[in-house]
Amino acid sequence: MRVVFMGSPDFSVPVLEALHAHHEVVCVYCQPPRPAGRGKKDRPTPVQARAEELGLPVRHPKSLRTPEVQADFAALGAEVAVVVAYGLILPQPILDAPDRGCLNIHASLLPRWRGAAPIHRAILAGDDETGICIMQMEAGLDTGPVLMCEKTHIGAEDTVQDLHDRLSGMGARLILGAIEALDDLVPQPQPEEGVTYAEKIAKAEAGIDWSRPAAEIDRQIRGLSPFPGAWTMLGGERVKLLRCRLAEGQGAPGELLEGLVIACGSGAVEITLAQREGKRPMERDEFLRGFALPRGSLATAS
């Protein structure tokens, strides 16, 4: 099938690779290169970089709303467009251009967690499961009817990165099945009950308040890892906490009990992966070997 692919970040790359292996990808749309790194040089998105390796034509318009861009899109003669974490809203002329419409791969169990950060929000909220939905796109934000859905359990120590990688592969597999069965699938309207929105993660959400219960802090650490990374002040430095587990122990909120077990308002968490400023992430034992933290030290919000 002639496919236009629209995506930008790492999450989208396995989907592009799967489509390229099984269909004719006539063009790839992604966000334009942006300044990144210490030199602030323009860096292409992961999708653009992979598309160019595969020899696929790439376009990165700043908007899809101009008549010229819409005419160019329609001229591709795509049978279907596949959209995953693209980064631009698709206006109606774009949605109408492919013969079979536009299919979106969304990383939640719709209608729960429509919007920009569904993986983060599922962990932060303490959800037991999440998944992938293949949706027929319409003008609303993630409101279209669902063609296919698959669930996955959220483990007690799963981070955003863990779910990101699992769901990305799941999305690549499901979209191939959806395209193959497109003539037989019956779009199911999303229920009106249970709608929630996954707002973008704000920087203010990353600072840890140790007076909160351990279960909440555990979800905060896992639900913000690796980006933006929940942080605390520890040993006079700002430290990102990237992996953890619930632990036994009591003490003053923020008190270092043993190793990297830190007391919370109720209960405690054990940090298993942490990152000092300017350093790479380190497992607990390696982190402690290079950072003297006496028992009773306090982790604080500022």
From Swiss-Prot:
Gene Ontology MF terms: methionyl-tRNA formyltransferase activity
Binding sites annotated in the UniProt record for (6S)-5,6,7,8-tetrahydrofolate: S108, L109, L110, P111
Listed EC numbers: 2.1.2.9
Gene3D superfamilies according to UniProt: 3.40.50.12230
InterPro entries (UniProt xref): Fmt, Formyl_trans_C, Formyl_transf_N, Formyl_transf_N_sf, Formyl_transferase-like_C_sf, GART_AS, Met-tRNA-FMT_C, Met-tRNA-FMT_N
CDD domains assigned to the protein according to its UniProt record, in alphabetical order: FMT_core_Met-tRNA-FMT_N, Met_tRNA_FMT_C
Catalytic activity: L-methionyl-tRNA(fMet) + (6R)-10-formyltetrahydrofolate = N-formyl-L-methionyl-tRNA(fMet) + (6S)-5,6,7,8-tetrahydrofolate + H(+)
UniProt keyword list: Protein biosynthesis, Transferase
Pfam family, one: Formyl_trans_N
Domain of life, source organism: Bacteria
Task of the protein: Attaches a formyl group to the free amino group of methionyl-tRNA(fMet). The formyl group appears to play a dual role in the initiator identity of N-formylmethionyl-tRNA by promoting its recognition by IF2 and preventing the misappropriation of this tRNA by the elongation apparatus.
Family note: Belongs to the Fmt family.
Name of protein: Methionyl-tRNA formyltransferase
Organism: Cereibacter sphaeroides (strain ATCC 17025 / ATH 2.4.3) (Rhodobacter sphaeroides)
Phylogenetic classification of the source organism: Bacteria, Pseudomonadati, Pseudomonadota, Alphaproteobacteria, Rhodobacterales
